[in-house]
Amino acid sequence: MPSSRYALVTYVRNPVGEFVEELRRELHPTKAHLAAHLTILPPRELTGTEAAALEFLEEACSRVVPFDVELGEVETFLPTTPTVFIQVKRAAYRIRELHDQLSGKELCCEENWPYIPHLTILKTELDEQARAACVVARERWAQFSGKRQVHVDELMFVRENGGCWQDVAPLPLGRGQLSSKL
């Protein structure tokens, strides 16, 4: 039986997230069930137990101060993969730092590609589908009038089970930080 894979994401539950989910429903209906998210740790098998990984993540996330990122333009990862995404433009370094800090212990693995902070719109089977979807996504994103910002204050540890991703545990950021209101 193959091992479960795990990932770490932050859900985008604001108008940007709604935009991405609506666009995905239109362009790739078979994946319409996926929630809009920024991937912090791409899918991987654990080197230890789920409980140990969760303990590490809880402690590490408690020391991270919540932050905002600003989104940039719509791009693709072609020719590497037929994925259409929105770039993280401002504060991408914060996402990369978080990725690097949390890639240790039970979550350590060799990733297939260099880590690039992004908000996935869709991943297709064929390059041509991704190119066509990218054209539509760029047009729609240019018309989006809301704030292109994501507040990162909670991560979600997720597990792949039978091809579906399930939430394992929420990980609030900054629990170990002193309040700035003291």
Regions found by a protein language model. Give the residues of each.
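Histidine-dependent nucleotide/RNA phosphoesterase domain, centered on the 2H-phosphoesterase fold
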Residues: 1-182
